[in-house]
Amino acid sequence: KGRYFKEFLEFYRILDGYIGQLKELLADDTTMIIASDHGFTELKYEFHANEWLRRAGWIDYRKNGKNGLENVSSESMGYSLIPGRFYINLEDRELDGNVKLEDYENVREELREMLLGIEGPEGGKVMKSVEVNEDIFEGDQMEIAPDLVALPNDGFDLKAGFGEKKDVFGKGPRNGMHTFENASLIIDRPGVSIEGSNLYNITPTILTLMNIKYDPSVFDGESLI
């Protein structure tokens, strides 16, 4: 339990009361939806992805005094942006790309295997999974999608940032962080099942409740009603 455990419980108790008051003000035929876009978990370590890449020989920096993406040298094989996005320094795509297209698949798979093998300071894998872009993205903007997306195990926060760091693993002021799982969804309408639902379902559901016509093909999710 954290230092302010009791204070947070009291905060949520008061917030719950306000939600109850709002519910009482709604007409009987009005549906209330309460949703969060993430869950929570304990934070043990921050993982500085670009520092890990630097120590693995995958990223190098220009000696220009800058501390951003423009500081990544043409000798680099890849870099990371938050949250857990990894880009291969691909020729003719990146500003100073040097990985040839014919080598792309092998380089990407090598990085993926390296990421999956990372262990934390206390043992245990840092990454829950590392996905290739074509398995999770589609559409007209694929050219700007990351080449790999890393999902951490609970307790690890994937950081980016450029420039040399003292350590690959660090600790910040927080002891909690967001997760992609365990988000909350409440729909107080009889007959609605939220089992297996996700964020993609929220907008179509709201549009259906408001009797607004829409083209289902433009959404990845479906209405829950």
PLM regions: where:
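Secreted, luminal/periplasmic, and some membrane-associated catalytic domains
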Residues: G2, K6, G20-G161
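Glycine- and acidic
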Residues: K1-F8, I187-V192
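A short beta-strand-to-alpha-helix junction
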Residues: E10-R13, K44, D60-I82, G97-E109, ...
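Short, low-complexity, polar/charged sequence segments that are solvent-exposed and flexible
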Residues: W52-R55, E105-R108, D167-G172, I202-I206
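Low-complexity, glycine/alanine/valine/leucine- and proline-rich hydrophobic stretches
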Residues: L151-T203, N211
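Hydrophobic alpha-helix feature that most strongly marks membrane-spanning transmembrane helices
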Residues: A27, L116, G120, V168-K171, ...
